[in-house]
């Protein structure tokens, strides 16, 4: 499939045929791969007459044809092969051989402020296969990255349309500051929302900077990795129009059983019986069990509400359309694109997403020494928000009355006036809109060979508008209400950079110097109002006509000034050195700590170029790398953390409304300084057996110090907390990726790619406080435990549910008494003489806790760590191509980590049915069903520690993607006057194997389920 994609790309970029002067004739030929595998066709190779725009590309059989005259020089090139030149003679047919590059070692890789050959890299930079990435039909590029690069973890917090997943590069290393990567799009710093808005077909390449040596050139913002995105640009030649679109539908990939009327009645009978001491729950009267006239009437009617069927659609539509135009001349080149994406929510309440995004990239060669360029992007999105409707649905009883006699929803489902979520959704409107644009302009000045100065300026503006309104019919609403919040984010970047390839006569030495100076200013403005008694229901457009009940205003800005210099030295194409240092000054820190210095060093040895390996036929590439660097972190903290900031306090005096101010909650800290991470990275790049097997294995170890942590203060100071530099963490792990080209032939190609990441981390210290033994002290209240991972739950460990076997039974005058068995040896004689001590009443069917430290009692010392982040991730994908057919399959797995499953409990004491107020069917304990999964239900009393049963191993294995495509042969498309035409079908999230009892093994917050998707698409160009 990679060959097909290269062919399609080359067609778009190189298929031009302009007239040339002189006597011309039609020539043809074939381009073949000169390798140990034999003469295989090279698909998508560009064949161009030197110094002209006249060219062609090879088809699926490696063949080409074009007009040329005798004496013309044909330049033949293809990604992954050494170029070749052939002089046109009297012959009309030419057979041209290209020699493969080892692992595509001449492929240019974006490294930040420039690019270089992959073979010359000394740092850890992963190039994402964007062709495979785009196969997954997702709303955002972030979701497409899942499983595409070792060391990169993508997690979905919600399945809601338009939601943006989080990305972590090599795990969590900061306690309070941000752990999100830095995004660079076409050289400009961008946000995750801007990355999410990119049309997938606009992406030319994505590089991920994973070690500190590659990240250090971005200094202050690069501690959590860098994602470099380069978008496509125009090429000289005929204009090419491309379209890629698909239409598909979504369905729930998992369904759960919810209680029927009889099952729910049995549940409530058990709950009442347990509270009232009734042995036989079936004797509890229906009226007593249901305790609600409406519920009793619904039960007698023989009907009940299937909430899952009520809240979910059978299928939800979504579609995507992207159109681009590329072309230009030797002077002016342009690329323009526009895309539209629409996704309907799987829930029947408001939850859709619309996005329009466009891009224009221009390059103008004014003079030989002067080039001007511009990158512009525009985007609009609208997201409908269902306001937690899923949670409301699942916490409602199946014995609910939801319709009136006309079949319309009613506001309350029972006599207790519990609201009807279906009715509430009709009278509640909540949406978020975003408008954004970026204008980036640059000038490249090259006064002499090897030297380029670039002046770059970028302006980004994003306006978010979030509106929420409830009409006068909303249950318990007290009249119509509305709120409107406008947030404006503006970023301005001015950058000067110099890149100089130092001329050295001795070809064994190559030296490149890069220097950068930049000024980055960001500001954020917020304005919001809340009103009541609107003249028009269910709209916030008339918010000015309501009675103001609240307002919000904020303004914040920060500035970053940076200087960077980097030297890259290549000795004999064997020994590679990379030195860099960046100095950043941030307005977020105090006068004495504004500046941070971030150096790095890297070395690589291309062992395969040494004489003792040069003649080893099966060894095509072997490179060893080592690097160390320091990067900074200022993300996730307030712009004014070092200053005393007042907070608004509105008040009234008589009939006059005043806005007053009080001291803020945080004590200002002038000594606040940069959080720093130092990373050592060791890597090995390999390619063997004619590069049929190639990949990378890396080990990294990171130490993060001066953690930006908010610590609690004594209330007598007048402040509740202060941001400070405290503590230290360490993380380490292994990244591995490999590709296996199993079959290479003219008609059949098959390759398999795998990515494996292993990660672990721990907190070394929080502050300098030590106990009597000199050990650093944990802070359990903040879930900061010395020696434990950073991102955790800290809670008791459930051992199931207490069973009959855990008790001794005594009979007193016909009454049975259950006493917990002796399991604790208090006097050390080897005989258990006391039961396990707990601070609550233990009974049959209650939650059983583990005595972790074995001291015979349950207390805070028995709490354990549940790590949220996975221990490892794994992906396996395969590409198979036979003639015009292509097949892709992708598996993804997560090992380790826990989630607190919100479907397994509804809080410790929430709802009238204690501990089990949602309608999802579970196997709860009864005297006749001694389950170990869920405790015995309660009605009016508490079910302590129920949440401990909701910690579940979040490991899963998922068949993530299958795609089948067919590309029409050239002889057909030529008759249709188009360059290429491909049809495809893609299915996602087909199978998931996990122990998590939820709609998704990842989602713990907003309970909007993920979906299974099937799409049918087409792409073509002409």
Predicted regions, residues:
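Extracellular/periplasmic, surface-exposed regions of secreted and cell-surface proteins
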Residues: 133, 179-180, 289, 319, ...
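Short, solvent-exposed loop/turn motifs
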Residues: 39-41, 53, 82-85, 189, ...
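Conserved small-residue
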Residues: 242-299, 724, 743-865
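Short, small/polar-rich motifs associated with maturation and membrane association
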Residues: 1-359, 364-366, 371-373, 438, ...
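Short aromatic-centered micro-motifs
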Residues: 47, 76, 183, 403, ...
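Extracytoplasmic gating/loop element in the C-terminal half of outer-membrane beta-barrel translocons
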Residues: 586, 841-844, 894-983, 987
